[in-house]
């Protein structure tokens, strides 16, 4: 086949394969952006105005020091936080919301992502993101790490005791 332009959407899981195919055919590629972040869970009332008035709020902030783009993504009103597993059992966090009333929770969750564009000679942003996820998995034996905002501000890990005293009940029950 021949074409002036093609679109290929292989996703993160197919990126290594696609890069190999391109290299084998002499096709130049560009290093993409990697998004690294956390999933934030708050009580519904915190996000009530945005949840009622927007389908999905897209909040964007640029950091003053490095001008990094920080954004919200995948907001789940009255939803739950969930674990997803990638190749080799890599645990990552995601969120879901359900239409049915019986599955709704009292919490809203969303991803808070920092978008990083690296400069040459760096070529592997997806591998970089995976390495960060693997280090997180190492800290908590392959589970999802949970931390309250208060503990984050104090620079300490959240203990089960402090989590039980929190005014928000996390929807992901096996987080550590």
Which residues are covered by each model-predicted region?
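Residues forming the flavin
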Residues: 1-176
